[in-house]
Amino acid sequence: MDSFNYTTPDYGHYDDKDTLDPNTPVDKTSNTLRVPDILALVIFAVVFLVGVLGNALVVWVTAFEVKRTINAIWFLNLAVADFLSCLALPILFTSIVQHHHWPFGGAACRILPSLILLNMYASILLLATISADRFLLVFKPIWCQNFRGAGLAWIACAVAWGLALLLTIPSFLYRVVREEYFPPKVLCGVDYSHDKQRERAVAVVRLVLGFLWPLLTLTICYTFILLRTWSRRATRSTKTLKVVVAVVASFFIFWLPYQVTGIMMSFLEPSSPTFLLLKKLDSLCVSFAYINCCINPIIYVVAGQGFQGRLRKSLPSLLRNVLTEESVVRESKSFTRSTVDTMAEKTQAV
């Protein structure tokens, strides 16, 4: 990818920050990987092992519960998106090891990176949807009792997947391969044909819909849930606070570098020193974003109960309790203060 201009980011080192500009100077390539690339490879390896196993377990647990619990619908869709994203990691790994050479052909250049992007954005939007559901359970319990059903949950998931698909379309439409000779390699990237306005518009839309809006949803929903929980408990446990901080902070920390570098590069000239520096950090930023795909199962387990209880209980059983427990809407016709507090505490693990 030495001869590529980076523009709007995408997942992989054949990403949307790569545009095909033959006038861009070719960097001198070394057989030694850069330090950011090496760090990215290490992160990808860890995320692959933890993410594939963890999300596969979540899919297995929730698949048996989707017919009777709404929570299982949320977490099944989220785990599927994260699981598919993690399965694509060998593609990114192979590209980095070969100095960003794309060995999979032109059709795969359009399809594979776009599928990666689809699953990643679906994961983000589903996470925001789950947080909104938790908010409604706490603040609109009567409405949830009357209208919160499996059909509505599946519709919400379909909307999240549909919006993720829309965010992915530019990657599919503008992605092409380019053959380079110094050194010999095939590069996969997007070509906006020097249309900077279109490139910047894509970057801004992805930043707003794929990061700022979900982040705002997570922050607002969990802040109000936290305030309600604390205001109605005689003994204010720090457990709820820890879960809220873990969810919001992990999303913000791991996605921020990718989104910031992406929007900056869409507005910078490819020859600028800042652009070239961000280009070298691309692999590391993508790997950080990928951490969010494997961290959710970890949060589920930690939020389930104390460490001693986890040692006495099988992991599948623990996950089943965390992921499929339903609100007290189904158990009671009226929501007392104690039941609302209990539900608010138990539905934080997203």
UniProtKB/Swiss-Prot annotation:
Pfam family name, one: 7tm_1
Main subcellular localisation: membrane
Gene Ontology biological process terms in this record: chemotaxis; complement receptor mediated signaling pathway; inflammatory response; mRNA transcription by RNA polymerase II; phospholipase C-activating G protein-coupled receptor signaling pathway; positive regulation of cytosolic calcium ion concentration; positive regulation of epithelial cell proliferation; positive regulation of ERK1 and ERK2 cascade
Highest taxon in the source lineage: Eukaryota
Keyword Cell division: no
Maturation and modification: Sulfation plays a critical role in the association of C5aR with C5a, but no significant role in the ability of the receptor to transduce a signal and mobilize calcium in response to a small peptide agonist. Sulfation at Tyr-14 is important for CHIPS binding. Phosphorylated on serine residues in response to C5a binding, resulting in internalization of the receptor and short-term desensitization to C5a.
Modified residues (Phosphoserine): 314, 317, 327, 332, 334, 338
Extracellular face residues: 1-37, 94-110, 175-200, 266-282
Region (Involved in C5a binding): 21-30
Region described as Required for CHIPS binding: 10-18
Transmembrane segments: 38-64, 70-93, 111-132, 154-174, 201-226, 243-265, 283-303
This protein's UniProt keywords: Cell membrane, Chemotaxis, Cytoplasmic vesicle, Disulfide bond, G-protein coupled receptor, Membrane, Phosphoprotein, Receptor, Sulfation, Transducer, Transmembrane, Transmembrane helix
PROSITE patterns: G_PROTEIN_RECEP_F1_1, G_PROTEIN_RECEP_F1_2
Subcellular location: Cell membrane; Cytoplasmic vesicle
Cysteine disulfide links: 109-188
Residues with Sulfotyrosine modification: 11, 14
CC annotations in GO: apical part of cell; basolateral plasma membrane; cytoplasmic vesicle; plasma membrane
Ranges of the Cytoplasmic topological domain: 65-69, 133-153, 227-242, 304-350
Molecular functions (GO terms): complement component C5a receptor activity; G protein-coupled receptor activity
Membrane topology: Multi-pass membrane protein
Subunit structure and binding partners: Homodimer. May also form higher-order oligomers. Interacts (when phosphorylated) with ARRB1 and ARRB2; the interaction is associated with internalization of C5aR. Interacts (via N-terminal domain) with S.aureus chemotaxis inhibitory protein (CHIPS); the interaction blocks the receptor and may thus inhibit the immune response.
Family under the similarity heading: Belongs to the G-protein coupled receptor 1 family.
General function of this protein: Receptor for the chemotactic and inflammatory peptide anaphylatoxin C5a. The ligand interacts with at least two sites on the receptor: a high-affinity site on the extracellular N-terminus, and a second site in the transmembrane region which activates downstream signaling events. Receptor activation stimulates chemotaxis, granule enzyme release, intracellular calcium release and superoxide anion production.
Protein name: C5a anaphylatoxin chemotactic receptor 1
Organism, as annotated: Gorilla gorilla gorilla (Western lowland gorilla)
Gene that specifies this protein: C5AR1
